[in-house]
Amino acid sequence: VWALLVCAAARPQWAGEAQKIESEGRNLMLVLDVSGSMTEPDFVLNGSPVRRWDAVQAVARHFLKKREGDRVGVILFGERAYLYTPLTYDLQTVSTLLAEADVGMAGRQTAIGDALGLALKNTVDLPAKSKVVVLLSDGAANAGVMKPLEAAEIAKKAGVKVYTVGAGSDTVEMAGLFGMMQMPRGDEIDEETLKQIAAMTGGRYFRAKNTAELVEIYDDINALEPVKNDAVFVRPVKELFFVPLAAAFALSVLGA
């Protein structure tokens, strides 16, 4: 009897087969500028000058590799905004399609408000805490129906966090009397509006003047919005202490 009681006190258990449990991940919309100015060759990849878009494309595809478990969609915008890929867990397909996108696909101007509005439309029915937008532009809003801050106000009410990125160098290379010279570039990026959008929605504004800064920015966003649904494996456990306890009770009754 004492041996059975000791066995019961040890709380024997039976563990079933491991079961995979998924927790909820982010619903992340990448909103990317493909207006005409994204052809400006002021970024560098692998030691060679490239267009802004080429750098953004490469960095965004690298970013996707770190978001396994999230649903990611892409909106491209220029004069118009359109849903390029809907929210999906198939990040390989998103990356492949992103590699095929190019400047001018949505017109030459910049409809920031419409692009953000479209991102909100495609996340409207999703849980607020899971919705994140990363909006990148190299210009100022000069097209579209919705104003950027109107869209930001809607995002705020819907609980959508918006990170904004201004992309483009501060200088431009021009030929002078003594060869090529770096000259200050005009204020192409409407940084004030991008900052306001981020502040209103609880996000952050970042400025990328070169490829290295762009990589760092997307790494920062990746850290700020960690993937929440790393798979967890658990084994269902059934308590068996009652078996020796019942046996000890039965023996004590019979021996009485």
Regions found by a protein language model. Give the residues of each.
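Second-shell loop/turn segments in exported
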Residues: 42-50, 60, 81-84, 100-108, ...
